[in-house]
């Protein structure tokens, strides 16, 4: 069956046509059974209306035919398109096969090129490794040349007679770095391999460095030969830099210090002579020699000039070592450059510079001291020396030569004081000295104490308490007081009665303690004099007690009582046979004459305290002796009455009876009775 439409004729297979007709019939039947009142159908129809189909009966009748016609046309189009798609698919398969073949060909070519590229990459990596190795070797060579090689022109500049400039120091620093680096490297590897090249470098650098330092030393030596340069050394930056470098080399330190010392000794010696004889025109200071007649001022002026000189020299030494000190603080230092060693080097330089003026200073000061014979002025010199020694000790180290010189001068002046005093006392001891009736200290003692008091005042108001040694001061006056007491004791050997000599000694000691007791720094001497006073006071008490007992006629009686203490009958017989009438007469005479004379003599004691103590202790001893006799009489059933009662006797002895009676004890009686 042929179907004709607006699209033309399409031939088909009979079976296909049959199937097609059945399908179309079925669809038409379905279309005929559609409820056109259904909204969905209406919506569909409206859509058809939008396609310019009118929802009318006629149009609906024609719809199945039009749909069938469109379906046929559509299927035909689909079949055609499927046919074209099949053709295109075959074409695509052909193209894909070509692409696959191209890809396979490309893969083969890529694999070949990859292998070639890998070979090229391996070659490149090998080249890079070789290049890095070469660069490392070049870098090592550069480092070696930088750290272990010095150019020939630099070596010539380092060791030749050319001037020392900044380039010289740079080359010398490099040479030292090469030497130290090679030495360290050689030392660390010497146990494993032999590096003769490093050893040779170390030896060469050692020779170059030694030659460079010798050149630097000669240059400095030449410049210091000029007095003007040596005098302005602190302001010379070139020389300070040179010495800083020289101080860094252990073998050159002592040579450099000795060189500076020689130059500074000459400068200071010249300056000392100038200050001594001509003065300083810039500061309008007069020559020190003009003060020579006044020894104290002369020595003070000398020490003042030395003080200023020490300050200047200290500043110079610190300026010379300042850079070296900073180097040690910033960098690790070897054993020869520890701070203590550097401090010792500075002290050595300062001592050496000052040594040149210490000897003439000491000689001139000793000559001036020998011209003095006034002990007060001599001690003024000691105070000045002590003051400056204390001032110097704050500037210089403890073992500085100037401190030793000042201490030597101080000891020399002490010795001069001792010599002057010994001469005076020797002259006095060989003079015919006499004791005055008032038993006051001799004139030479008074003069000595006045001079000593002047010295004590100076010492008490001293500004150099830490500077002047106390030991020689105390020893000097301890010996002098001993010598004075010896002379006074020699004066009293022939004095009668003997207790007058003891009174004189107590008066001398009282004067001494009155002066010495004013000063706390003389406590040891004061205690020593107090011990002497106690000694003579006890001697006086014992002597008076024995004299009282002898003058009262009690000596034999007390001795017999002591001997017969255990034999009461013998004691009783002895006491019965004793001539008591004569005993009472002697006792009365003692009270009237001897006691009053002795008490009058005791009033010559200048110390009321000592007087009262002697009177009281003598009274206690004498009353104790009387009570010993009374007790013996009581044991023997005898009764004898003394001219005075105990209270009356104490009053006669010029002591407080009530106070003294309370102090009387049997132990004192026994001890003093035996004496």
UniProtKB/Swiss-Prot annotation:
It is a peripheral membrane protein. Keywords: Cytoplasm, Golgi apparatus, Membrane, Nucleus, Protein transport, Transport. It comes from the Eukaryota. GO terms for cellular component: cell division site; cytosol; Golgi membrane; Golgi transport complex; nucleus. The keyword Iron-sulfur does not apply. GO terms for biological process: intra-Golgi vesicle-mediated transport; intracellular protein transport. Its main location: cytoplasm. Signal peptide: none annotated. InterPro entries: COG6, COG6_C, COG6_N. It is found in: Cytoplasm; Nucleus; Golgi apparatus membrane. Belongs to the COG6 family. Acts as a component of the peripheral membrane COG complex that is involved in intra-Golgi protein trafficking. COG is located at the cis-Golgi, and regulates tethering of retrograde intra-Golgi vesicles and possibly a number of other membrane trafficking events. This is Conserved oligomeric Golgi complex subunit 6.
């Amino acid at each position: 069956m042929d179907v004709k439409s607006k699209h033309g004729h399409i031939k088909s297979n009979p079976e296909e046509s049959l199937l097609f007709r059945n399908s179309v019939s079925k669809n038409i039947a379905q279309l005929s059974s559609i409820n056109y009142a259904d909204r969905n159908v209406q919506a569909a129809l409206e859509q058809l209306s939008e396609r310019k189909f009118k929802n009318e009966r006629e149009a609906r009748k024609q719809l199945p035919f039009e749909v069938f016609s469109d379906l046929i046309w559509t299927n035909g189009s689909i079949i055609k398109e499927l046919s074209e798609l099949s053709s295109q698919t075959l074409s695509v398969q052909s193209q894909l096969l070509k692409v696959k073949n191209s890809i396979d060909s490309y893969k083969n070519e890529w694999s070949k090129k990859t292998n070639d590229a890998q070979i090229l990459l391996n070659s490149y990596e090998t080249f890079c490794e070789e290049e890095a190795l070469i660069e490392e070797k070049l870098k090592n060579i550069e480092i070696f040349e930088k750290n272990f090689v010095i150019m020939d022109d630099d070596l010539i500049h380092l060791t030749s007679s050319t001037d020392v400039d900044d380039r010289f120091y740079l080359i010398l620093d490099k040479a030292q770095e090469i030497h130290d680096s090679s030495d360290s490297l050689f030392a660390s590897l010497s146990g494993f391999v032999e590096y003769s090249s490093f050893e040779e470098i170390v030896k060469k650098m050692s020779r170059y460095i030694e030659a460079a330092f010798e050149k630097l030393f000669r240059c400095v030596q030449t410049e210091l030969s000029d007095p003007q340069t040596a005098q302005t050394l602190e302001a010379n930056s070139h020389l300070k830099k040179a010495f800083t470098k020289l101080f860094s080399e252990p073998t050159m330190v002592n040579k450099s210090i000795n060189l500076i010392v020689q130059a500074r000794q000459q400068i200071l010696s010249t300056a000392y002579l100038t200050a001594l004889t001509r003065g300083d025109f810039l500061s309008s200071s007069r020559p020190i020699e003009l003060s020579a007649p006044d020894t104290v001022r002369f020595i003070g002026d000398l020490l003042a000039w030395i003080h200023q000189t020490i300050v200047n020299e200290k500043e110079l030494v610190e300026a010379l070592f300042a850079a070296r000190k900073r180097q040690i603080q910033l960098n690790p230092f070897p054993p020869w450059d520890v701070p203590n060693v550097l401090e010792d080097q500075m002290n050595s330089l300062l001592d050496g510079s000052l040594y040149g003026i210490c000897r003439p200073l000491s000689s001139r000061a000793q000559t001036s001291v020998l011209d003095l014979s006034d002990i007060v002025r001599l001690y003024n010199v000691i105070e000045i020396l002590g003051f400056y020694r204390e001032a110097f000790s704050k500037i210089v180290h403890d073992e500085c030569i100037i401190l030793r010189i000042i201490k030597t001068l101080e000891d020399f002046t002490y010795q001069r004081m001792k010599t002057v005093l010994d001469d005076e006392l020797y002259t006095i001891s060989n003079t015919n000295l006499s004791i005055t009736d008032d038993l006051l200290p001799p004139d030479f003692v008074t003069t000595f104490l006045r001079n000593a008091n002047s010295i004590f005042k100076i010492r008490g108001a001293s500004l150099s308490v830490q500077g002047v040694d106390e030991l020689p001061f105390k020893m000097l006056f301890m010996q002098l007081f001993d010598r004075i007491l010896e002379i006074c004791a020699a004066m009293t050997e022939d004095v009668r009665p003997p207790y007058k000599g003891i009174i004189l000694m107590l008066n001398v000691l009282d004067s001494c303690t009155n002066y010495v007791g004013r000063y706390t720094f003389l406590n040891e001497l004061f205690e020593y004099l107090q011990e002497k006073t106690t000694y003579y006071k006890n001697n006086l008490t014992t002597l008076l007690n024995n004299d009282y007992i002898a003058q009262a006629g009690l000596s034999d009686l007390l001795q017999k009582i002591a001997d017969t203490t255990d034999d009461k009958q013998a004691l009783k017989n002895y006491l019965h046979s004793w001539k008591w009438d004569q005993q009472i007469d002697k006792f009365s005479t003692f009270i009237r004459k001897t006691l009053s004379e002795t008490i009058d003599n005791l009033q010559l004691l200048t110390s009321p305290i000592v007087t009262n103590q002697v009177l009281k202790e003598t009274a206690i001893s004498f009353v104790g002796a009387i009570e010993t006799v009374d007790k013996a009489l009581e044991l023997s059933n005898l009764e004898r009455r003394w001219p005075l009662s105990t209270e009356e006797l104490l009053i006669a002895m010029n002591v407080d009876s009530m106070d003294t009676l309370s102090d009387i004890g049997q132990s004192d009686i026994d001890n003093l009775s035996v004496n």
